[in-house]
């Protein structure tokens, strides 16, 4: 999969280049040229997996220049109980607001207390 800069679509890089570079030369962010399309069947299969399993599947689709082994190693080393305080890096919390049930995905766990992939 290839990635373009949000500031200049002519700047095209691989996933590995986008990760290593971080931000494009023109200050833009890298975004995929295309997004994988998931069927209902694929979504149902993802539901059967834990967080790490889902991450491995999605990363494999977006990071096509990495091997399965590289992705597995990265996921296993990134989402550890020691780093997140739990085996589930992004737990769901449940709440009610004005009589409506809400599902809240907690993305602040982990060393950065910020966004998770």
Which residues are covered by each model-predicted region?
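PLP-dependent amino-acid enzyme catalytic core
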Residues: 1-117
């Amino acid at each position: 999969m290839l990635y373009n800069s949000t500031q200049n679509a002519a700047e095209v890089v691989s996933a590995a280049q986008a990760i290593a570079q971080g931000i494009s030369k023109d200050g833009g962010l890298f975004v995929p040229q295309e997004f994988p399309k998931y069927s209902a069947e694929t979504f149902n299969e993802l539901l059967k997996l834990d967080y790490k399993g889902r991450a491995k599947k999605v990363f494999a689709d977006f990071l096509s220049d990495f091997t399965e082994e590289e992705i597995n190693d990265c996921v296993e080393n990134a989402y550890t109980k020691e780093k997140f305080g739990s085996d589930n890096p992004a737990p769901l919390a449940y709440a009610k607001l004005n009589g409506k049930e809400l599902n809240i995905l907690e993305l602040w766990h982990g060393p950065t207390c910020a966004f998770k992939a």
